[in-house]
C-alpha cells in the first residue's frame, strides 16, 4: 500500500482510486483523507475479522468515513443503513444512499449484444460493456459518485465524453476481468469472481436467465 501511494505521488495522478483491502476501520488504506468515500454493499464475508452480523460489518466499513468528507452508500439493508447514517452524523459528513428512489441515476437498463444499455437521469442513454442485471446497482453508485465529484465546492472536471467512454470501454481501460466475462460462446463459458453468498445471489438469476439448448444435466458449474 505504501509503495502504491508513493507511485501515485510520483506519477502525479489526477485521481487515485484506493480500494480497501479488508473491512475499513483498521485497514492500512485508511490513513488517507479522501475527497469522496464510497461503500458499495455489505455482505457476510470475512466474519472472523469483521463480525458476525451485517450491522457489525457495516460498523467496520463505516470506519472509512472521514470528517466532512462526502460518502456514497451503494446498497444497504435495514440493519446497515442506521449504522452508516449514525457514523456520517458523528463525522459531519454528507451522506447519499444511491439506491434510494430519489437518488437513483438509472431508470432502467436493457441487455444488448455487447453489454447493457442504460437510461440515465443525467446523461440519457449510456452503453456499458459489463453484463449482468446487478450492474444497474453499480451504475447507480458510480454516477452518483461522479455527480458529487463534479459539483462539489472545488469540482473535478470530468467531461460527459469521458464518462461515456469509461462506461463503454471499462475492461479495455482498466483491465477489469471476471465480471460475467464471456470466455467463449460455443459452448458458453462464463468467468465471474463472485465468491460469497451475496455474489451468488446476483449470479444465480443471471445464470438461470441464459438460454439453454441442452438438458439441464449438460449444464455445468465449476467452483
PLM features: what roles do these ranges have?
Residues 3, 79, 175:
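Short, conserved clusters of charged catalytic residues that mark active-site
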Residues 2-25:
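Glycine-rich phosphate-binding loop used to anchor ATP phosphates in small-molecule kinases
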Residues 25, 80-83, 199-202:
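Phosphate- and divalent-cation-binding pockets in alpha/beta enzyme and binding domains
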Residues 15-20, 28-38, 42-47, 56, ...:
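Nucleotide phosphate-binding/pyrophosphate-handling subdomain across enzymes
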Residues 11-19, 39-125, 139-161:
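Acidic, Mg2+-coordinating active-site environments of NTP-dependent enzymes
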Residues 4, 84, 219:
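Aromatic/hydrophobic pocket-lining residues that form π-stacking "cages" and hydrophobic walls in ligand
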Residues 4-8, 61, 203, 207:
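Generic hydrophobic alpha-helical segments
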Residues 9-10, 89, 172, 208:
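Residue-level signal for alpha-helix termini/capping positions
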Amino acid at each position: 500500500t505504501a509503495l502504491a501511494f508513493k507511485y501515485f505521488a510520483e506519477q502525479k495522478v489526477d485521481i487515485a482510486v484506493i480500494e480497501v483491502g479488508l473491512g475499513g476501520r483498521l485497514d492500512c488504506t485508511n490513513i488517507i483523507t479522501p475527497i469522496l468515500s464510497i461503500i458499495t454493499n455489505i455482505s457476510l464475508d470475512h466474519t472472523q475479522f469483521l463480525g458476525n452480523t451485517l450491522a457489525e460489518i457495516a460498523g467496520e466499513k463505516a470506519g472509512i468515513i472521514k470528517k466532512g468528507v462526502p460518502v456514497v452508500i451503494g446498497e444497504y439493508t435495514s440493519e446497515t443503513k442506521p449504522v452508516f447514517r449514525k457514523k456520517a452524523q458523528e463525522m459531519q459528513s454528507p451522506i447519499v444512499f444511491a439506491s434510494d428512489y430519489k437518488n437513483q441515476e438509472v431508470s432502467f437498463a436493457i441487455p444488448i449484444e455487447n453489454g447493457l444499455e442504460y437510461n440515465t437521469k443525467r446523461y440519457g442513454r449510456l452503453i456499458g460493456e459489463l453484463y449482468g442485471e446487478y450492474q444497474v446497482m453499480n451504475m447507480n453508485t458510480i454516477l452518483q459518485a461522479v455527480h458529487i465529484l463534479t459539483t462539489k465546492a472545488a469540482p473535478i472536471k470530468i467531461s460527459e465524453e469521458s464518462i461515456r467512454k469509461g462506461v463503454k470501454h471499462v475492461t479495455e481501460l482498466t483491465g477489469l476481468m471476471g465480471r460475467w466475462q464471456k470466455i467463449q460462446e460455443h459452448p458458453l463459458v462464463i468467468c465471474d469472481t463472485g465468491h460469497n453468498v451475496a455474489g451468488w445471489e446476483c449470479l444465480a438469476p443471471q445464470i438461470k436467465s441464459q438460454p439453454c439448448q441442452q438438458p439441464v444435466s449438460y449444464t455445468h458449474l465449476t467452483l
